[in-house]
UniProtKB/Swiss-Prot annotation:
Coiled coil: none annotated. Keywords: Cell membrane, Membrane, Transmembrane, Transmembrane helix. This is UPF0754 membrane protein GTNG_0550. It is found in: Cell membrane. One of its GO terms (cellular component) is plasma membrane. It comes from the Bacteria. Its main location: membrane. It is a multi-pass membrane protein. It comes from Geobacillus thermodenitrificans (strain NG80-2). The chain crosses the membrane at residues 7-27, 357-377.
Amino acid sequence: MNTFVYLLFMMAVGALIGGMTNFIAIVMLFRPYEPIYIFGKRLPLTPGLIPKRRRELAEQLGKTVVEHLVTPEGLRRKLTDPVFVAEVADWGREWLKRWLSRRETPAQLLERLGVHAPDEWLSELAAKQAGRAYEQWSETWRLRPIRDLLSPELKETMESRIESLADYLADRVIDYFSSEEGKRQIAGMIDRFFQERGMVGGMMQMLLGNVNFVDKVQSELGKFLRHAGTRAMLARLLWTEWNKWISYPLAAVEEMIGRQRIKETVSAAARGLVRNNDWLDRPLAELIAPYERELFDRFVPQAANAAIHALSDKIEGIVGKLGLADIVRNQVESFSLRRLEVIILSIARRELKMITYLGALLGAMIGAVQGIIGLWL
């Protein structure tokens, strides 16, 4: 019985010493927070390990986060994950729905963005952009013939209407000369014709009679313009002029009309298009309504996917610019030692307790061995 009590006592003492040793070692990781001096001499192991190595701990944590935890590769995998992309698209749809539900007009949106008199600002912007776009387009195409500027469909459409244009012009000329004003024009031309012939012309005019001659010329002119051969000739003339015109370079057209004048016309058209439209005062939801399905089903997912891939392509630079290591280091250094202790203990409390218990177990085993040796000796 005495032997058993003796061994139990040795194990208890060993467990107490082992457990307390490990407990004190764990406490000394954090405590004391400040160095302790006795008679001007700093006590060894003060301050504790973590307070003493706080800066190095912060730097190592920052490096660990950047090099092993929050890496560009890991962020890229997360960004390009189909589930995440779908979630971003859903978020985009929800945001767009909320935004459209406010019934905000383009004018109100521009005013909220700091634009005063949105209609004037937008019309001038459209005019400048249209003028600039024409200049850039002209610089690219001004030495090319006009036929190269026309799409095949437009060229075919215009050429298919040349014969009908010839008929239209002939009919309009007939209508004009059949009118009273046309008759006066014919009479005037006949009078000038005879006057230019002097006495002979006057005698001819007296013999023929002006009115009957006007009717005769008017009738013959109508027959001439209605004749199929005349219209075919007019169509050939239009074809010749058309082919000549489309062979001119754009620069020649600009020279005839004036490049600045063309630019001003384009700018004025763009300005008028904005000013003479009420879309600035209509709700965005109403303007987008015809395209809402395509906007939500196609545009938003495509925009989300494009934005995510653009972000993914630049992720290394973004991570570098963010300076995650510095952020972690500064954050850890800003923690109070008490808070740092609480954070570490909240993470490793169970493991630290197990270390204390392991020390007690090892102490008990050592005490038992010592007791057995003591009894044997």
